[in-house]
């Protein structure tokens, strides 16, 4: 984001592991923040913070609600009180039904909070739903890492790739750089009051992705709460923003296997 805009960027997070050294960084748990203006005067706030991943949400639903829903309410109120536009990162899991798992429910409540403050408190906001984001610096360890990150770590440890279920579930993978491009376009075009679906519009089976890595695959019992399919079919981001995702998962995997996972490639 910093490479593509002239804005001064302030990062507020509880981990600085992937924070650039030239950003202004505040180490906070957003559940403890009530007034974001103490960090400065902002032109816009990108609310990208969430406790993610479906499976851990069954064990720790309270953490998901307090972070993804309650903290979003406090942020939305701060933005509306101070006339700061808000871009909220929603989830493609919305389409599997809000009661599918605690994570999806908590993110949907966050969306509803944003809509409520738009309708009744004058909040200028847009919701951007992310589809299976991957790319450089994604987590590779712990319960909150992505599928691609998990498999990269297993490859680095010379372990087989684990598939839960039969591998036929399908996912629409979107590169983080394409996500950033869309967020910048929302800001540049003042595209407020929208819900944008940020997916490539092409999905792959989990087995297909595993085969792209060319490593041994192990199968385990399926896990609850997972959607069978994610696929972005909405064209609003293209129609309104002129956004076109440029990066694809095949090239990313090839680059990773050849030690070039940070190189930007296009179809």
Where are the predicted features?
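Flexible, glycine-rich beta-alpha linker
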Residues: 94-102, 126-146
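C-terminal "lid/loop" region of Rossmann-like NAD(P)-dependent oxidoreductases
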Residues: 166, 195-196, 204-210, 214-234
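Conserved beta-loop-beta element that borders a ligand/cofactor-binding pocket
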Residues: 86, 90-91, 113-137, 162, ...
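Conserved Rossmann-fold NAD(P)-dependent oxidoreductase catalytic core, especially the SDR/UDP-sugar
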Residues: 47, 70-104, 126
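Glycine/proline-rich active-site loop of Rossmann-fold NAD(P)-dependent oxidoreductases
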Residues: 108, 133-149, 157-164, 168, ...
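Conserved C-terminal active-site "lid" loop/helix of NAD(P)H-dependent oxidoreductases
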Residues: 17, 176, 208, 223-255, ...
């Amino acid at each position: 984001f910093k490479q593509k805009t002239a804005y001064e960027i302030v990062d507020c997070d509880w981990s600085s592991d992937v924070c650039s050294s030239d950003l202004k960084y505040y180490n906070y748990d957003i559940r403890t923040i009530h007034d974001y203006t103490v960090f400065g005067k902002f032109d816009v706030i990108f609310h990208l913070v969430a406790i993610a991943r479906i499976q851990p949400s069954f064990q720790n639903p309270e953490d998901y609600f307090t972070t993804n829903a309650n903290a979003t309410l406090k942020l939305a109120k701060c933005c509306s009180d101070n006339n700061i536009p808000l871009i909220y990162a929603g989830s493609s899991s919305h389409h599997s039904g809000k009661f599918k798992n605690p994570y999806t429910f908590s993110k949907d409540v966050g969306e509803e909070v944003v809509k409520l403050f738009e309708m009744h408190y004058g909040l200028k906001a847009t919701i951007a739903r992310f589809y299976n984001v991957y790319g450089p610096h994604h987590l590779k360890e712990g319960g909150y890492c992505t599928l691609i990150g998990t498999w990269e770590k297993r490859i680095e440890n010379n372990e087989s790739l684990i598939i839960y279920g039969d591998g036929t579930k399908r996912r629409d993978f979107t590169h983080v750089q394409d996500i950033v491009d869309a967020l910048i376009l929302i800001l540049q075009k003042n595209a407020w009051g929208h819900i944008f679906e940020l997916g490539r519009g092409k999905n792959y089976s989990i087995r297909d992705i595993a085969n792209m890595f060319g490593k041994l695959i192990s199968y385990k019992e399926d896990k609850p709460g997972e959607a069978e399919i994610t696929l972005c079919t909405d064209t609003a981001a293209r129609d309104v923003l002129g956004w076109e995702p440029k990066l694809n998962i095949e090239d990313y995997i090839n680059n990773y296997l050849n030690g070039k996972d940070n190189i930007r490639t296009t179809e």
